[in-house]
């Protein structure tokens, strides 16, 4: 029944992944050890998309946990939800990738990858009808970025016709862990463009801004950031996990969201974002939700969509809401801001409704947009990449692991191509497409 196998790689990927499983297991009425005490049929109906039932109402996540060092794994295993995961599905090395993409992709990671693929294969075999994979990782480190992208391409080889969705945390200038992040991120984007079907871009900088501005947290921890990411992941996947009409699996989401195969980098947002203590003091209405959801301050991707245009976007509302009210609101937003949507894709705003609200809220809305302004993210990384690469700074760490400078040049030009493709479609208008055939004919006649 339309299963999804989840992989989490590297420290960031594992922490985000753990938060995601915590969120969705409580939404489906599972306790910390995976025993089911669901109160409604809706919680049970599509449980097997993410969970495998192993007798007497115990459910185990279809999750594969990967890292090149044991630290994060030990933390998850000894954490509150450690007993949820299947012990054989923890695959880890002893060395660490040391924030070096080449180590994750070519040396250390390559030694571990066959072991991981075995576990993935076993998970896939226990599915009735596997729809695809999702992976949580960061693009700035060594394991999540290097080994994460290696896993994606290996899974692509083995399961060429299955969907591949990634939740990728991009490095941000304000919150930098290591100086080589621009290298790691560029090399990763180079891989994601080719091998992933949909990439949800999440940005630490935007998450920090939300925590400090909206949630009024003076010094947000990674726990707070991961809480935000898991909320948005739960919102995106709600249409896979609960009965609904629109975007009910990964492929349908991609069909609605990806007009050109390379342009599959989405920005995500969520509403209502209220600080933990203030939730109970206000009732949300659909107009308020919609307003908040289209507010650039609610985006978890640090680029301003007002600088670009939406090719497509999709909104998932959750809770007891009338479909008509949602449609009216979305229509009015679309009409008021029609300049922000390309006019050559009609009906490019999709809405879905799921009647099960997230824990602790009456209603919520999750936003996924394919906007041309996502090029700002890549631009930021590219500028930093170029500054270092011109001087060949830190390159010896990568060439020492057997990489070639050529690969950096290729990755850089692939990312530049991606940015110019976004730019081209941002500027395209309806009339562009119609003029070209005549222009070609005219040139042809002139030659004769």
From Swiss-Prot:
Biased composition (Acidic residues): 432-448
Residues holding Mg(2+): 69
Pfam families: Tubulin, Tubulin_C
Biological processes per GO annotation: microtubule cytoskeleton organization; mitotic cell cycle
Subunit structure: Dimer of alpha and beta chains. A typical microtubule is a hollow water-filled tube with an outer diameter of 25 nm and an inner diameter of 15 nM. Alpha-beta heterodimers associate head-to-tail to form protofilaments running lengthwise along the microtubule wall with the beta-tubulin subunit facing the microtubule plus end conferring a structural polarity. Microtubules usually have 13 protofilaments but different protofilament numbers can be found in some organisms and specialized cells.
Organism: Aspergillus fumigatus (strain ATCC MYA-4609 / CBS 101355 / FGSC A1100 / Af293) (Neosartorya fumigata)
GO molecular function: GTP binding; GTPase activity; metal ion binding; structural constituent of cytoskeleton
Cell location: Cytoplasm, Cytoskeleton
Name of the protein in question: Tubulin beta chain
Origin: domain of life: Eukaryota
Keyword Transmembrane helix tagged: no
Region named Disordered: 429-448
Cofactor: Mg(2+)
Keywords: Cytoplasm, Cytoskeleton, GTP-binding, Magnesium, Metal-binding, Microtubule, Nucleotide-binding
GO terms under cellular component: cytoplasm; microtubule
Family to which this protein belongs: Belongs to the tubulin family.
General function of this protein: Tubulin is the major constituent of microtubules, a cylinder consisting of laterally associated linear protofilaments composed of alpha- and beta-tubulin heterodimers. Microtubules grow by the addition of GTP-tubulin dimers to the microtubule end, where a stabilizing cap forms. Below the cap, tubulin dimers are in GDP-bound state, owing to GTPase activity of alpha-tubulin.
Record's keyword annotation contains Magnesium: yes
Residues at which GTP binds: 11, 69, 138, 142-144, 204, 226
């Amino acid at each position: 029944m339309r299963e999804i196998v989840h992989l989490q790689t590297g420290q960031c990927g594992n922490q985000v992944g753990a938060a995601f499983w915590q969120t969705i297991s409580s939404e489906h009425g599972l306790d910390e050890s995976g025993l089911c005490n669901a109160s409604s049929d809706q919680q049970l109906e599509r449980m097997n998309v993410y969970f495998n039932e192993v007798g007497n109402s115990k459910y185990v996540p279809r999750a594969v946990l990967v890292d090149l060092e044991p630290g994060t794994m030990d933390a998850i295993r000894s954490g509150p939800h450690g007993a949820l995961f299947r012990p054989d599905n923890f695959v880890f090395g002893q060395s660490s990738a040391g924030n070096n993409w080449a180590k994750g992709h070519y040396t250390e990671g390559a030694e571990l990858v066959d072991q991981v693929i075995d576990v993935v294969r076993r998970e896939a075999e226990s599915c009735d009808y596997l729809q695809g994979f999702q992976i949580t990782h960061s693009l700035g480190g060594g394991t999540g970025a290097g080994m994460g992208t290696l896993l994606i391409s290996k899974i692509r080889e083995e399961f060429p016709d299955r969907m591949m969705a990634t939740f990728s945390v991009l490095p941000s200038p304000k919150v930098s862990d290591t100086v080589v992040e621009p290298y790691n991120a560029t090399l990763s984007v180079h891989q994601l463009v080719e091998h992933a079907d949909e990439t949800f871009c999440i940005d630490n900088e935007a998450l920090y801004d939300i925590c400090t501005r909206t949630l009024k947290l003076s010094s947000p921890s990674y726990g707070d950031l991961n809480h935000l990411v898991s909320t948005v992941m739960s919102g995106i996947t709600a249409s896979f996990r609960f009965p609904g009409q629109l975007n009910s699996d990964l492929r349908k989401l991609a069909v609605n969201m990806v007009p050109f195969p390379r342009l599959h980098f989405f920005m995500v947002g969520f509403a209502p974002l209220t600080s933990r203590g203030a939730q109970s003091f206000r009732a949300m209405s659909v107009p308020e939700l919609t307003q908040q959801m289209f507010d650039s301050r609610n985006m978890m991707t640090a680029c301003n969509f007002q600088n670009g245009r939406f090719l497509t976007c999709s909104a998932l509302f959750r809770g007891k809401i009338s479909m008509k009210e949602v449609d009216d609101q979305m229509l009015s937003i679309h009409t008021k801001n029609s300049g922000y949507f390309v006019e050559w894709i009609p009906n490019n705003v999709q809405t879905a409704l799921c009647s099960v609200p997230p824990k602790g809220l009456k209603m919520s809305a999750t936003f996924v947009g394919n906007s041309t302004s996502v090029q700002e993210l890549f631009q930021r990384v590219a500028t930093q990449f170029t500054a270092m690469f011109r001087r060949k700074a830190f390159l010896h760490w990568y060439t020492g692991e057997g990489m070639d400078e050529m690969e950096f040049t290729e990755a850089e030009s692939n990312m530049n191509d991606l940015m110019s493709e976004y730019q081209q479609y941002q500027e395209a208008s309806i009339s562009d497409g119609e003029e070209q055939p005549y222009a070609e004919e005219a040139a042809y006649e002139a030659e004769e």
